[in-house]
Regions:
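Membrane-water interface of transmembrane alpha-helices
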Residues: 17-33
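Interfacial helix-start motif at the membrane-water boundary
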Residues: 43-60
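Membrane interface segments of multi-pass transport proteins and intramembrane proteases
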Residues: 30-42, 139
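Helix-boundary and loop/linker segments of multi-pass membrane transporters
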Residues: 1, 39-45, 97-101
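Pore domain of cation channels
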Residues: 8-14, 18, 81-90, 95-139
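Outer-pore turret/helix-boundary of cation channels
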Residues: 57-85
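Transmembrane helix-loop junction
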Residues: 27, 31, 71-72, 128
Length: 144
């Protein structure tokens, strides 16, 4: 029961981080119109680069949340190992060279599921931005 509560708390924290980060990006995105209307391609590339960096930072924050819990619970020997384990688990790479103890293994699976869903959310968000750029380009270059 305790581990289920830990998992639920971490999942909720990750959703809060992801939501807050995406909402901040959405708040910032009205400036996209001026980027889209700019004749300079480098501004569009710069916009995408900023979005990608921001999204990677959001996911790294989530990875560190999981890692901190694993480290504080004494499941992993140091924070560096915990971050490494959490990163390969969250991204579902799962090398298997670092593992949790029997009681905590299920949390690794939940972290992986959380990562899949939230990375998917980020992918959908980036797709929406790129689609918006494409639609704008199409209207300008192929108005028919």
């Amino acid at each position: 029961m305790y581990l289920a509560l830990v998992a639920l708390t971490l999942l909720a924290a990750c959703v809060i981080v992801q939501s807050a980060g995406i909402l901040l990006l959405i708040h910032w995105l009205p400036r996209v119109r001026e980027v889209l209307e700019s004749p300079h391609v480098y501004r569009r590339v710069g916009l995408l680069l900023r979005v990608f960096v921001w999204i990677v930072l959001l996911h790294l924050i989530q990875v560190v949340l999981w890692a901190f819990v694993f480290f504080r619970a004494g499941e992993l020997p140091n924070l560096e190992t915990a971050v490494y384990f959490s990163l390969v688990t969250y991204t579902t790479i799962g090398f298997g060279d670092v593992v949790l103890g029997p009681g905590w293994r299920v949390l690794a699976g939940i972290e992986g599921l959380t990562g899949i869903v939230l990375i998917g959310w980020s992918t959908a968000f980036v797709f929406a931005i790129v689609n918006r750029m494409y639609e704008h380009w199409r209207q300008v270059h192929d108005p028919a």
